[in-house]
């Protein structure tokens, strides 16, 4: 489902459960991913939480404006999404780039964050690694997710 946030862009999201009767957990994916990355986690999380997954600006089915992106912009998008959905506070978490966005969100919008969790992330990009991140972003943009999947398949499967 898509919704306009901050009078600026449309964000794609999925909301499982009832945010009026359950605490909400907001999940933010990593670079080149989408809200679908959290699909396997939904059955267990939705037993206790309303689960909000969203496609970060420039990813999945969200708008892809032709402008620079930053953790600050993505954090503002999440705050705008919560406002548009009339959600006052969330537990929030993210992996990789999503973890960096989650940290920025918690710093910039502490009144919206009850608590957070971070996976495989950092608070800043090491200057030596900046080129590698740019390369990953370019591959995702020009060659698509199949190329990203091929590169990531060299890592161990955490579910085995």
Predicted feature locations:
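Conserved alpha/beta-hydrolase "nucleophile elbow" surrounding the catalytic nucleophile
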Residues: 29-31, 90, 94-99
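Conserved HGGG/HGGXW glycine-rich cap/lid loop of the alpha/beta-hydrolase fold
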Residues: 9-67
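The conserved SAM/SAH-binding core of class I Rossmann-like methyltransferase domains
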Residues: 52-54, 95, 119
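Flexible "cap/lid" loop of the alpha/beta hydrolase fold
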Residues: 100-108, 112-143, 147
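N-terminal cap/lid segment of alpha/beta-hydrolase-fold proteins
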Residues: 1-10
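Hydrophobic alpha-helical packing elements
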Residues: 41, 74-77, 148
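Conserved acidic catalytic loop of the alpha/beta-hydrolase fold
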Residues: 72-90
